[in-house]
């Protein structure tokens, strides 16, 4: 623990096309080897495809997909007297977004479609329809938290 003041989280610049900080964060998570312009072009073309499929604006469709993947509870390991318990804890709003975006990108990378933009568009549209690998991941996390509800009193 730091003995001096706690440094706050840095603000990131909103993305140039839509002016959204959430989308800028998503592009940063999508980025590989510091190639931001490549990540931006992949994200924008995926959002364009998603908007055409859903009939909503790009940001609206992205927000819906993200909302369906955001976890509300997760489990954290807590060691008590020689045994480790999986303790369910509520997820902070910033971490909710980070986890949802990370899961969507991971699921898109595992898909077998041709281009990354298409994989990402398919994963986002699946997430918007409440199906797909990223939504399944959220369901698994919620199921783990539900199964370990008995250890909720070990929260710290």
Swiss-Prot record:
Could you tell me which species this protein originates from?
A: Salmonella choleraesuis (strain SC-B67)
Similarity remark = Belongs to the universal ribosomal protein uS7 family.
The upper taxonomy is: Bacteria, Pseudomonadati, Pseudomonadota, Gammaproteobacteria, Enterobacterales
- Report the gene name: rpsG
Name recorded for this polypeptide: Small ribosomal subunit protein uS7
| Cited function | One of the primary rRNA binding proteins, it binds directly to 16S rRNA where it nucleates assembly of the head domain of the 30S subunit. Is located at the subunit interface close to the decoding center, probably blocks exit of the E-site tRNA.
InterPro entries assigned to the protein according to its UniProt record, in alphabetical order: Ribosomal_uS7, Ribosomal_uS7_bac/org-type, Ribosomal_uS7_dom, Ribosomal_uS7_dom_sf
The molecular function terms in GO held by this entry are: rRNA binding; structural constituent of ribosome; tRNA binding
| Any one of the GO BP annotations | translation
Q: What SUPFAM superfamilies does this protein map onto?
A: Ribosomal protein S7
**Signal peptide range:** none
